[in-house]
Amino acid sequence: MTSNLKYKRVLLKVSGEALMGDKQFGHDYDTIKKIAGDIKELIDSGVEVAIVVGGGNIYRGINAALVGMDRASADYIGMLATVINALTLQNVMESLNIYTRVLSAIPMMSVCEPYIRRRAKRHMEKGRVVIFAGGTGNPFCTTDSAAVLRAIEMNCDVLLKATQVDGVYDSDPKKNPNAKKYFTINYKDVITNNLQVMDLATIAIARENKLPIRVFSIKEQGNIAKVVQDQGEYTTIEE
């Protein structure tokens, strides 16, 4: 079955906000269980999966910096929030009998493994889902940056960016009902038009390494597997 798959190894970027469901803060476990179920569907189809989680449901370093906190310190706190989310997601996934490992860019030996590239790849080869926490381990970098870097390091075929909308638009569709959706768009146009998909430096890294990105809504159950199978609603960013 694996031989017929377009993408055999993927990295899924899940924002912290996606784990909140309709709440204003923290975790909605029904929502997380649905996401875990979608990931299981993908694994059962024969796809190797890695995940990068954000931390915005708990803490946003950039917002704290705006009110006077030292930006580097704020970003480190945000990285710790991603570890909380990774451990939460791991526990929910393991309740569905999905074998997982959490690897953190910030060493926390008593709660998860340190990020070591070869170890992470070995886990994936053994059929385990690897959840990357701690961002890149450096301040002033987004978890989107971590997602692109880890996807490249893991030799993933595609980055799946799960968002609150069903693709990339020329303006915010929540504010502009006439916003135009792109079904495919190249990296250059994302950068030139300053589309707020992810930070532009990260898009440039994806472009340099020819990493395709698919942007889709995580709200629709079953959407992750659909996007990998060229079904459902999404936008593809590639050369």
Curated annotation (Swiss-Prot):
It catalyses: UMP + ATP = UDP + ADP. It is an enzyme of class 2 (transferase). InterPro entries: AceGlu_kinase-like_sf, Asp/Glu/Uridylate_kinase, Uridylate_kinase, Uridylate_kinase_bac. It is found in: Cytoplasm. GO terms for molecular function: ATP binding; UMP kinase activity. ATP binds at K13, V14, S15, G16, G56, R60, T163, Q164, Y169, D172. UMP binds at G55, D75, T136, G137, N138, P139, F140, C141, T142, T143. GO terms for biological process: 'de novo' CTP biosynthetic process; UDP biosynthetic process. The keyword Nucleotide-binding applies. Keywords: ATP-binding, Cytoplasm, Kinase, Nucleotide-binding, Pyrimidine biosynthesis, Transferase. Catalyzes the reversible phosphorylation of UMP to UDP. Homohexamer. NCBIfam families: pyrH_bact. This is Uridylate kinase. The gene is pyrH.
